[in-house]
């Protein structure tokens, strides 16, 4: 199916706004999440059970989800870039509201300590977009992204004396300076499999989760000189 002009404009906005980010949160990440979200949507029969509007909501939310990410925010005004873009593109208020709600509520920090994702957690559009973003955070690509982000922040690779933080608060999670790169697996990435919202997301997460577990086993053996 041919891309709409709005989708092409969204892609261009993503390329411009994420150009200065490290490779863990660059335009390629947004495009992978979009492709995953649409794939999950089709697997969940979203395009068959709902109108094409649902797929447009999924695609735009997935593409635009990391614009204005707090980790890369240079100016508070950037938080309104997506909203302004949707207005400029003539997206109706109902559709725009759904897209913005998905983006606002899909982050891991919003779900820490059992916090609710609100009404959006019950929509399939929300589920496939959030699952797609989380799938890109685990598995082989997730491992690569984790170490890329850690390196960009000069984070310690691993320190056996620094243990993963249990029962993280939202504030603690957002304080990236307190993490080591390997501990991020235990504090977030290994939890994502059980937080998937869709059946399709759960199925795909199993393989990626297993790959991370195998990687960490090998990592610890090499770190301690056993391998």
Description of each model-found segment:
Residues 9-20:
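Generic N-terminal amphipathic, Lys/Arg-enriched alpha-helix
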Residues 45-60, 90-105, 140:
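Acidic/histidine metal-binding catalytic segments
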Residues 2-11, 53-56:
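N-terminal glycine-rich anion-binding loops that anchor highly charged ligand groups
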């Amino acid at each position: 199916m041919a891309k709409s002009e709005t989708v092409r404009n969204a892609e261009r906005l993503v390329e411009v706004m994420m150009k200065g980010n490290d490779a863990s949160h660059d335009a390629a990440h947004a495009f992978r999440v979009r492709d995953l979200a649409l794939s999950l949507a089709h697997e969940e029969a979203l395009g068959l059970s709902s109108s094409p509007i649902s797929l447009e909501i999924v695609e735009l939310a997935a593409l635009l989800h990391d614009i204005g990410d707090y980790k890369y925010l240079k100016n508070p005004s950037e938080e309104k870039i997506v909203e302004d873009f949707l207005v400029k593109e003539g997206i109706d208020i109902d559709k725009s509201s759904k897209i913005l709600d998905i983006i606002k509520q899909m982050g891991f920090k919003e779900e820490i300590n059992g916090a609710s994702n609100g009404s959006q957690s019950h929509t399939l559009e929300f589920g496939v977009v959030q699952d797609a973003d989380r799938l890109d955070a685990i598995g082989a690509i997730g491992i690569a992204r984790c170490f890329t982000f850690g390196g960009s922040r000069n984070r310690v690779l691993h320190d056996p004396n620094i243990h993963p933080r249990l029962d993280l608060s939202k504030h603690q999670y957002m304080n990236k300076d307190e993490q080591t790169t390997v501990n991020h697996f235990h504090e977030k990435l290994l939890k994502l499999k059980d937080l998937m919202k869709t059946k399709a997301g759960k199925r795909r997460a199993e393989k990626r989760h297993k790959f991370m577990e195998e990687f960490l086993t090998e990592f610890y053996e090499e770190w301690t000189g056993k391998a």
